Amino acid sequence: MTLDRTSGEPLPAQLAGQVRSLVLSGTLATGDRLPSSRALAADLGVSRAVTEQAYDQLAAEGWLEARRGSGTYVTTTRPSGVTSRPTEPTPRPTRVTSRPAQPTSRLDTGTPFFDPRLEPGWRRAWREVSVAAPPRGYDDPRGLAELREALAARLGRTRGLDLHPDEIIVTAGTTDGLRALLPELRPGPVAVEDPGYRAAAETVLTYGREVIDLPAVETVRDLGAAVAAYVTPAHQHPLGRVMPAADRLSLLEAARRADAVVIEDDYDSEFRYDVAPVPAMATLDRGRVVYLGTAAKSVVPTLRLGWLVAPPDLHELILRRRTITHAGAAWPSQRALLTLLRDGWLDKAVRSARRVYAERAPRVAEAMTPYATLAGPLAGMYSTWLLPEPDARCARDAARAAGFEVNLLSTYARSTGLTGLVIGFGGVTDAELDQALTALTGALAC
């Protein structure tokens, strides 16, 4: 055995790793006696502390056994079927000095605008979290009572929902809310919009349920065997369509006939800048709709907070499971959001983002209209443009070469043939947006 003093790995760790390798290779077998720590240290030219630490570590892991007055022995032999050569460690990444291979900016649908003028309020909220006394034991599985009260007030004011705070369950985001709901539904497939939110379809599949494609641009009159339908009626993801009132009523009637629930993902609902936001679909039938909301688009995705409102029977089932599993949103994030709500910070953030989106959306439309067809109204933090797949890929590749990632509409589709580009404009600067549009339209103009 040899030790490398120039390596960044500590000497005891090197020695322990080499002994493990000798056992795994079969060179050392159960019952073999190792040199004393003093003798091995002398052979290797290191201090005795190095060999003692290595032996102690290997003994703690169950490879070696120290017998008083006798020495140190191997206690573990390589099981049959285990490779005699340990897995090679993954090479550490080297410092990158050239331009990254991947785009540096993302024009996606999930990154909102964050007004730097609001940073002081954001920091103040987290300072308050840092000095607040944490709860002793597990907190309420529904979430902080004060936060639920603030959310109930806000959802009543902005989404038309008349809620008691106890009807709200705070989650770690929309997908967490869906994960909480799926085990409580009766067996059967779940209908998900197509094209639609990819994470929703993948989550349904993860829970062992079949996904039925629900055409996002058609009126739904029959849900078939589906036990639930996942929709984004306020601003369909990714087409941007607002579900008309007649289509909402038709979907609810289809759900009643199928004894299914409608899962309303209230995605991007607050960012209408042409008309007032459409009230939540849950206002039409609280007994049939499971409402999912998130702070990811109005605050930041990394806050990892959302909320769920379900009919009473499902509410109790979800709450019971979350009580047993101690599932729930992180307490610091809940406290921070509570402060942001109480201080009026969230309202300011929404107004600021809405103004920015209202200015950027027409710029995107002006650039793209000569080459593509807008799929929905100008609303929210992205717009979707229909065009042939070869043209969309060519434009996407040009944007990548310029350092920007733009999503293809086809990546959201499962069975529909819709193709085009989904252009987000929340998470970039004005200058970056102009650069990206120049790259996109330059490719489309060829």
Regions found by a protein language model. Name each.
Residues 1-128, 134-136, 323-329, 338-347, ...:
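N-terminal basic, amphipathic alpha-helical segments
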Residues 69, 283-317, 328-332:
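Active-site PLP attachment segment
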Residues 110-113, 174, 233-237, 297, ...:
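Short glycine-rich anion-binding loops that position phosphate/pyrophosphate groups of nucleotides
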Residues 135-258, 270-272, 276-284, 290, ...:
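Conserved core of the PLP fold type I
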Residues 207, 284-285, 370, 402:
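Short, structured coil segments at secondary-structure junctions
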Residues 210, 261, 404-405:
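Residue-level detector of anion-binding/catalytic polar loops
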